[in-house]
Amino acid sequence: ESTLINIEGLPIQGIWEDFDNDGFLDIIVAGSKHSIWRNNGDKTFTYVEAFDNNDMESFATGDLNSDGFIDVMGGYANIYTSPSDIDDVVWLNQGNSNNYLALNLTGVISNRNAIGAWIEIHGDWGVQIREVRAGESYGIMNDMKQIFGVGSSTNIDSLVIKWPSGIQTTLLDVEVNQTLNL
């Protein structure tokens, strides 16, 4: 365990995702060396051996099998965009018993993809916030579905969506382990 994260090699991409749905955002980095760092929830991170020994140059994330856990599509190149002999790989997250809430947002007055929407969930853990983005790192487009890990919590007190148009949607007493299409 370490408060400091030692990212080796030449990092090209990096984003925050909650891979274990414990409510704390983890870090994934790709480049000449890839790494995943699990957020311990106490301002420290632990390195996770998650992939094979071939270092990803690129990746995209999303819930590919709709189980509520973030999966990874790993791309292999020879620095940036030069092709390599290594096939790209999909890693399906095997998950755990932690709970989640997934959101697919579609703008009606706001832009169709809800880019710029600000989402808050409130519960016994406090507040979690996400923003719908069109891109998060160098050369990638991740799934726009927003997934909130809530650990062992079985209920979300409130869900607040602040749409780019200025409209606000609030839902109370939201059940976990579901995907809402709003």
Identify the meaning behind each predicted range.
Residues 1, 19, 37, 45-47, ...:
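Conserved hydrophobic/aromatic "anchor" residues
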Residues 21-30, 67-75:
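Acidic/hydrophobic-patterned starts of short beta strands in beta-sheet-rich repeat architectures
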Residues 15-17, 60:
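Conserved beta-strand position repeated across blades of beta-propeller domains
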Residues 45-60, 64-182:
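Gly/Ser/Thr/Pro-enriched helix-cap/hinge segments flanking short amphipathic alpha-helices
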Residues 4-8, 50-53:
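Surface loop/turn motifs at the tips and blade-to-blade linkers of beta-strand repeat domains
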Residues 32-35:
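Loop/turn residues immediately N-terminal
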Residues 11-13:
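Signature of short aromatic-glycine-proline-rich micro-motifs recurring in repeat-based ectodomains
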